[in-house]
Curated annotation (Swiss-Prot):
GO cellular component: plasma membrane
Localization per record: Cell membrane
Function summary: Intracellular vesicle trafficking and protein transport.
Mode of membrane association: Lipid-anchor
Name of this chain's protein: Ras-related protein RABA6b
Motif Effector region in this chain: 42-50
Gene Ontology molecular functions: GTP binding; GTPase activity
BP GO terms, sorted: protein transport
Key words of the record: Cell membrane, GTP-binding, Lipoprotein, Membrane, Nucleotide-binding, Prenylation, Protein transport, Transport
Disulfide bonds: none
Major place of residence: membrane
Similarity annotation: Belongs to the small GTPase superfamily. Rab family.
Binding residues annotated for GTP, in chain numbering: 20-27, 68-72, 126-129, 156-157
């Protein structure tokens, strides 16, 4: 169950990005996840936008900083700074427009060119509420995800279907990857319970902090910060 928390202190920051063609629903997915809002008159993103949401992992509060960028070619100059430091990505297409699915290969190639090999990627087929206009079958999305080693699900920002699941599965997997890396690094360094790469591994504790993850406090913002337990 999610609950609102406007002033809760946060322990760590995870940056994630939304990627895909213009008008696939990136902004509405972000507003649905961060503020539980949906706008039928949503306008294309100009440049870059971002929002926060707090997620509880073990005994830590993680602030998920989700970045949304315009899908238009004229904004591609911001590419490198947009991807820098991203630990996760939602790769989004519109199930009613096949061209947006075909372009996933381009977006994935760009992501892999600018991000770490450990970046967690979730393939998202959005607008599942428009099944009568579907041009991309769900099985096609699953097949592509399996071939590329991605997670997959279909969402509807309008009906709030699988939106939580898409973001939280990404954040949860980021936590798993970082925890495994910390444990492995500590074993290689012979420091089972000592500090390594900016993290401490206490017995029985879940670890989320390495050099890519930054300790932070909530910023003063009008956006809702929700904790998921």
């Amino acid at each position: 169950m999610a609950e609102e928390s406007y002033d809760e202190e946060c322990d760590y920051l995870f940056k994630a990005v939304l990627i895909g063609d213009s008008a696939v629903g990136k902004s509405n997915l972000l507003s649905r996840f961060s503020r539980d809002e949906f706008r039928l008159d949503s306008k294309p993103t100009i440049g870059v936008d971002f929002a926060y949401r707090n997620v509880r992992v073990g005994d830590k509060t993680i602030k998920a900083q989700i970045w949304d960028t315009a899908g238009q070619e004229r904004f591609r100059a911001i590419t490198s700074s947009y991807y820098r430091g991203a630990l996760g990505a939602l790769l989004i297409y519109d199930i009613t427009r096949r061209i947006t699915f075909k372009n996933i290969e381009k977006w994935l190639s760009e992501l892999r060119g600018f991000s770490s090999p450990e970046t967690v990627v979730v393939l998202v087929g959005n607008k599942s509420d428009l099944g009568q206009s579907r041009e991309v079958e769900e099985e096609e999305g699953k097949t592509l995800a399996e071939s590329e080693g991605l997670y997959f699900l279909e969402t509807s920002a309008l009906e709030n279907q699988n939106v939580e699941e898409a973001f939280l599965s990404m954040i949860g997997r980021i936590h798993e990857v970082l925890t495994q890396k910390i444990v492995l690094d500590n074993r290689l360094n012979g420091d089972g319970n000592n500090e390594s790469n900016g993290a401490v591994v206490p017995p029985g504790k879940e670890i989320v902090n390495i050099h890519e993850v930054t300790a932070t406090r909530p910023l003063s913002t009008s956006l809702s910060n929700c904790c998921y337990k």
